[in-house]
Amino acid sequence: ELVKIVKEHGMSLEAEVGSIGGEEDGVVGMGECADPKECKMIADLGVDFLAAGIGNIHGKYPANWKGLSFETLAAVQELTGELPLVLHGGTGIPDDMIKKAIDLGVSKINVNTECQLVFAEATRKYIEAGKDLEGKGYDPRKLLKPGADAIVEKVKEKMILFGSDGKAE
């Protein structure tokens, strides 16, 4: 029913299958792997994107993280065909794992935590340097600019890693 409503309004729909680890919107998951057959069932409903749990985690990764399950990702890709796959919890995943996930069909990678972290760090440095006390440095446009600039630089870095740099029309 939701797929029909979304299509009628020219929107896209992304489904998340399996438990993505970490905390997102107050829900805590352990990072289990999705069942590829369940992913196929959800894909067959007509969703536009599929985010399958493959050991990924929202937020920061713990030191004892086991890594992504490429076996699960390959099985999901095989069963769902050309459906674009999404990797939630992309922050902190090593570059070689990101590239392998892309090779196995991931076409969207969420890295919001990474953007939040660089924003907070740059804003903190601005305040700790006392720049908010100089002239009108307290102006939100000035106060938040270092953080916004840090996000821009992080996104550029990720676009190169993800292979999307220079592809916009």
What is each model feature region?
Residues 128-139:
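Active-site gating loops and adjacent loop-to-helix segments of metal-dependent hydrolytic enzymes
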Residues 151-153:
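Acidic, glycine-enriched catalytic cores built around paired aspartates
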Residues 141-143:
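Charged interaction scaffolds used for protein-protein
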Residues 85-87:
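Active-site neighborhood of phospho(di)ester-bond hydrolases with catalytic His/Asp-centered motifs
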Residues 1-83, 95-109, 121-124, 129, ...:
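Alpha/beta enzyme core
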Residues 145-147:
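Metalloprotease/metallohydrolase-associated module, dominated by Zn2+-dependent proteases
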Residues 89-93, 111:
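Short acidic/histidine-rich active-site segments
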Residues 113-116:
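Short, acidic/turn-prone active-site loops that include or flank metal/cofactor-
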